[in-house]
Amino acid sequence: MAFFKKLKEKLFKSSSKLDEGLDAIIEDGGVEETIEAPDVPLDDENAKAILPEPEPEPEPEPEPEPEPEPEPEPEPEPEPEPEPEPEPEPEPEPEIAAQTPAPKAGLLDRLLGRGETKTVVRRELDDDMLEQLEELLIQSDMGVDTALRVTANMAEGRFGKRMSAQEIKQLLTEEVARIMEPVAKPMPLYATKPQVVLVVGVNGSGKTTTIGKLASQFKAAGKSVVIAAGDTFRAAAVEQLQVWGDRAGVPVLTAPEGSDPASLAFDAMTKAQADGADLLMIDTAGRLQNRQDLMEELAKIVRVIRKKDPDAPHNTLLVLDATTGQNALSQVETFKKLADVSGLIMTKLDGTAKGGVLVALADKFGLPIHAIGVGEQIDDLAPFDPEDFAKALTGLE
């Protein structure tokens, strides 16, 4: 629940854009309607709040015990007559209130829920409204195909009906959650030791930070982890992993800058096996400007670690930057060809107004989404929850 609150706060760019856009669509051509509360009798609990409580019956007083007869007292001397008390002055009459309060609803009306009305703007779900919805979803980076499919599903059985902004948001939330539900899967953990996790992604996607967060979380869960800083051409990536490793108490294997990443992966695999580590996480380069070199590099890493374990890597995670929008789709296409991608992690959802790209990815590729990130802290990376994400995206309360 804490992460959902954080997600909702940090997805304010996307949610406010969709939220305000949906409100504007309903306002444009909508008509204000008066809603009267239904005549439904209140339940016992609410009726008690309205009805006066009956006064409790007084308990019978206990009979007094017989008192002993008093001894005869001597006759007192006669007292002087008291002086007459002065007559009290008459109290001034209270002033009449200047305004008479508005009459409250009668008890019967209150019991039946009458007397309370409110207004709501509703608009007919027609072709014009659907077109506006499609444009809004495309602007949020859901993509044309996904936006058309979502609006078509929203209109099914509801075309021609009058709908409020809240009802449209509820519908959109349900449709987004329906698309995301099948892909919301945590990263699988296996009995194999070490479980090799190959992490790929373009430079700047948050790949290195994600490895550090995952390693820290696995270590906190009682797993032993080894990290291989396989992006040997970027000194900053190696240093960043070393910082995360020191913070989490996870060993980080490094190699001289520009050295062979496959050789480092082999050494890391040897150490992880010798130590009986649960997980080996291997960072990789992300230089998409030279795809041929990258493809050969990744293929070599896989060949080398398979000499140690024919089933490795057991997971290949693609880390994506949400701020790249529709470019994330082309990155998935590319890395699916370069490596056998088994799952996605989406980072930087706190910095984009186009969180709908995650819906497009789920709709187009159907790859498992293991986690999403909304910040720099360790707990800002959390398992993907489709309902929480859908509510945060649409701004639904």
Which residues fall in each region the model found?
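Non-catalytic terminal/linker segments enriched in charged/polar, low-complexity residues
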Residues: 1-175, 185, 220
